[in-house]
Amino acid sequence: MINTIYEIGEWPKDFTEVTMIFLKKKPQATKCSDHRTISLIARTAKILAKILRRRIEKKIWDVLGEDQFGFRRGKGTRDVIGMLRIISERTLEIDKERSVCFIDWQKAFDRVNWSKLMQILKKIGIDWRERRLISNLYMAQSVKVRLNRGETRSVKTERGVRQGCCLSQILFNLYSEYLTKEALEGLRDFKIGGQIIHTVKYADDLVLLAKEEKVLQDMIDKLIEIGRCYGMEMNVEKTN
């Protein structure tokens, strides 16, 4: 069955339908933000997604910068903290001034533009069969919510990567990589040991680095501008 789906590029309906359940983050949860959503996906769909991931991940890893630490083998939050600490120490040794901004994208994983994502996958050389499968998966995807009184009707989604799918991590990393590259292209302001370093990333968390506050503000403005072209909105309250 997996081989047939792969050859024709069409996913069965039960593979593309996701059931969402809500778990309380705290006992007295009254708002939507007080709950955590969990996606229930068909087991066979997960198997096919894992096969698909193995076929495309090498080309994606090859284009990701060394500044991305999220969802990568052998890398984690400790590496991010260590890198930021080294940058801070080296900067203090050679310069008195530096500017840093911690960027937070609003619901980043839910805002990925599918058309833009497909263009990027084609650009890095992902085979048309894999692109077709990914595109058809998203185009056919529907979501229903499971509540105490039953389940809601299924509704189509129009953007975003799938929660709980192993493809989502690498697809988002790739999407984020192209967004930041386009926004900060040509920037040569901040160097450590002769190497240009202006971002540190962990999945959707982004740190911008600059020597001067004015340059940093220009980077933020450009990131907001290009981010909107990618369907992203900066969370002003959490960006600092």
Predicted regions and their residues:
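Conserved pre-catalytic core of RNA-dependent polymerases
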Residues: 1-175
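Structured loop/turn residues at secondary-structure junctions
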Residues: 43-44, 195, 211-212
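Catalytic palm subdomain of template-directed nucleic-acid polymerases
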Residues: 108-124, 161, 199-230
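Short, conserved micro-motifs composed of acidic
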Residues: 234-240
